[in-house]
């Protein structure tokens, strides 16, 4: 898991997300606390439970982006889900326990990748030997036994010459015939919603029945080296230890991000069973509080999994969540709506900002694009004004405005190869001015 300090985490998030300092601080502290807990003695570690977070803020201000960037920084099992995808147990739809099963699958994949990297060098050595055996098969006598001859030294020298060529890549395109593991037959099983776990078990059973079979294949040496390295690495990895390590990682370092949690708040005017709202909240309770979930890899405890939830809460309020769930989300963070100044910063400051992306895209057609400061100010102001007069969709409005602004340039780029275009205030007004001023047009076009 990540050993970054809260300050380093916030600094990294600042490279991609503008503003929202409180939210960044909260997730940075929560992530660092995961590391701190793992440094404690076993007796105290089991008593320290994570402080789950509820992020509240309008759409398009960076809630989901914080989760996306956090996933890359965490270096721990991480999964993002939409609360609206689930229904109460016993009804058609996904059950909340699939969250933990998916998290465990992510942990297995992560741990497997790390284990493969550890044995990569040894696997490459063994793959190299197998390729050399295919290139220089040992001489055999009439009874099929390897011949012992005085030419062993010569053979060894030849092998070293081929080894050198192989490492230098001079034999990459040469074809050889090697024994590789035959691809496992995939068995597609159509299952009703909520029965995914049973389907996975059936698929695994059918694959195990097929067993490990070898197949002679003719392939280029560079492709054979990759296939044989993966095969040898898989042999060197202990699958049982890998599974135990992955489950431990999921239980102690796992992070679950639940988006759109405001959409499962009960509405006051509804009547009858609310299987996709309050029912889901009640099913989430034991997961967040701490329970044991059965997965195909083994039993997984959720006591120390960190849950980060977020919602716009434009119709509902955080107090509309059932009281028990509110109590399980002790840290509340409010994200602020974005201003025109924030929009300007979003267009220029983040790594791979929108303006950078369009400049790079047009460069592929040999068209130079330059955004002037007054042009960027005008784009930011246009996006902010449309948000104010119509529906406020936050930073996502910039994508719509930029697409409209760049529409003509993108279409004619192939005819403008070698030219340079300056996007200044006058150009932006000529393309967007009428749309921004006319509220009815803004509603339908921007």
UniProtKB/Swiss-Prot annotation:
It comes from the Bacteria. One of its GO terms (biological process) is protein unfolding. InterPro entries: AAA+_ATPase, ATP-dep_Clp_protease_ClpX, ATPase_AAA_core, Clp_ATPase_C, HslU, P-loop_NTPase. Keywords: ATP-binding, Chaperone, Cytoplasm, Nucleotide-binding. Pfam families: AAA (PF00004), AAA_2 (PF07724). Gene3D superfamilies: 1.10.8.60, P-loop containing nucleotide triphosphate hydrolases (3.40.50.300). Coiled coil: none annotated. ATPase subunit of a proteasome-like degradation complex; this subunit has chaperone activity. The binding of ATP and its subsequent hydrolysis by HslU are essential for unfolding of protein substrates subsequently hydrolyzed by HslV. HslU recognizes the N-terminal part of its protein substrates and unfolds these before they are guided to HslV for hydrolysis. NCBIfam families: hslU, PRK05201.1. A double ring-shaped homohexamer of HslV is capped on each side by a ring-shaped HslU homohexamer. The assembly of the HslU/HslV complex is dependent on binding of ATP. This is ATP-dependent protease ATPase subunit HslU. The gene is hslU.
